[in-house]
Amino acid sequence: MDSITMVETETLSKTLIKPSSPTPQSLSHYNLSYNDQNIYPEYIFAGFFYSNPDGHEISTIREQLQNSLSKTLVSYYPFAGKVVKNDYIHCNDDGIEFVDVRIHCRMNDILKPELRSYASELIRPNRSTVGSEDSTALVQLSHFDCGGVAVAFGISHKVADAATILSFIKDWAASTCDLSSSHDVSTPVLVSDSIFPRQDNIICGQFPASPNCVRKRFLFSPEAIERLKSKAIEFGIEKPTRVEVLTAFLCRCATVAGKSAAKNNNCGQSLPFAVIQAVNLRPLLELPKNSVGNLISIYFSTIKENDTVNIEQEFTKLVIGELRKAKDKLKNLSQEKLNYVARMQDFANCLKELDISSFFDMENVDIDAYLFSSWCRFPFYDIDFGLGKPIWVCMFQPHFKNCIILMDYPFGDDYGIEALITLEQEKMPAFENNELLLSFASN
C-alpha cells in the first residue's frame, strides 16, 4: 500500500445518540466559562485502535457502544446539546452524531509508521470546525477487513480539554464493559462558569488555519528520554522531567531548522522564539480529575538569547529554567492563604493577565512561538471497551503552526513519548533530517 488514498471507506450509517433519560428543564442552560469562551470552536479527537482478538461481531460492538454512550450522556448532558452565541450550551438532548464506517483494508496496513499520521485522519469524521447546527460531540466506529476496530471520539474544544475527554471516555468505556450489571457512570463535576465566570460579548472567531504547514510524528523511546535526562543532569539541572527535556530538545531542533530555512530562503536573521506550555489547572485548583470544561491555562517564556541554540548546555538550561520560572509564577497564583471560594475568584482574576487566547496572537507577532501540549501521564492506553487495551492511541486537532503534541507511547512494558509536530513546509525538511534529532528519535 503506497498511499492512504488507495483505501476505500464506506459509511454504513449515521445516527444521533441521545441521553437514555431526558435532561430536566432546570438543567437546560449551561453557561460557558471565560476560558471556554476564548477557545476556538474546533473539534479535537482521540482515536483508539483495537485488534479485537476475541472476534466480537461488529453488530454487537456497535449496539453496546451506542447503548453505553446513551447512558453516559445522562451525566454528561451538555455534550448532547448545542453551543449558543459563544455564551452557553442549550442542553436540549439533540444528541451525539454516531457514524459507522467500514474501512476496506487490514488495520496493520494503515498502522505502518509512514502511514500513521494519515490513519488518525481516516478513523474520524472529516470535520474540523464546529458549526452552529453541528453536534457538539462526534463518534466514529470504524471496522476493518481483519476484524479490528477503531473508536474515535471528537468534541468541540469550546466545551472540553484533554482531561475532560479522558474522563468522558473512561466512563463510557466502563459503562460499555458493564452494561449487564448495576454499574453507574461516575458523576462528573460540571463546573460551568463557577470558577471562571462567563463575560458578555466575548467574540471568538474561526481557528487561524496554517495552510502551508505539514504534520509529522516522531517517537522517543524510554532509553532516548533517559539519555536526554542524563544530559540535563550533567548540565546542572535538578530532577528534569521527561516533558521538560523533550521540550528543550525539540525547541533546539526546531530553532536550528528555522535558522536553516531562513538562510535557504534569504530571509535574513531567524527570529527569537517563545516556548508556550499548556497546563492542566485541576491539580493547582485542587479540583477533581473529572471536572468538566477547559480548566487549562498557559505559561510561556520568550527566549531572547537565540544564539545559544548553538550551545547545547546553555540552551537546555535556558529553556528549562525559563519554563520553570513561568510555571512557578502560575503555581503561586493558586497557593494564596484564602478560603476556597475567594481563592477561586482571585485565581480567575489573575489569569486574565495570562489570557488563554493570547498565544494565538503570536501568529501576528515577529517571534517564532512554539506551543507545547502534553497528554503524557493521561492513561489513554488503559481505555477498554471490552475489546482489550488499544494497540495505538492517536489524537487529532486542526493544524496550527509550531504546535507540538506529546503523548505516551508503549514500548513493551514501558512508555516512551510520541511527538506530533506541525511546522511550516519549508522548515520541516531541515527539522526531520537534523542529525541530532535522528540520534534520539525514530518514525
Swiss-Prot record:
Pathway: Alkaloid biosynthesis. GO terms for biological process: indole alkaloid biosynthetic process; response to jasmonic acid. The active site is at H157, D384. InterPro entries: CAT-like_dom_sf (IPR023213). It is found in: Cytoplasm; Nucleus. The keyword Isomerase does not apply. Its main location: cytoplasm. GO terms for cellular component: cytoplasm; nucleus. Residues 316-343 form a coiled coil. Keywords: Acyltransferase, Alkaloid metabolism, Coiled coil, Cytoplasm, Nucleus, Transferase. Expressed in cortical cells of the root tip, especially in hairy roots, as well as in etiolated seedlings. Mostly expressed in roots, and, at lower levels, in leaves. It catalyses: (+)-minovincinine + acetyl-CoA = (+)-echitovenine + CoA. Induction: Induced by jasmonic acid (MeJA). It is an enzyme of class 2 (transferase). A motif (Nuclear localization signal) lies at residues 215-222. Component of the monoterpenoid indole alkaloids (MIAs, e.g. echitovenine, tabersonine, lochnericine, 19-hydroxytabersonine and horhammericine) biosynthetic pathway; MIAs are used in cancer treatment and other medical applications. Acyltransferase catalyzing the conversion of (+)-minovincinine to (+)-echitovenine. Monomer. This is Minovincinine 19-hydroxy-O-acetyltransferase. It comes from Catharanthus roseus (Madagascar periwinkle). The lineage of its organism: Eukaryota, Viridiplantae, Streptophyta, Embryophyta, Tracheophyta.
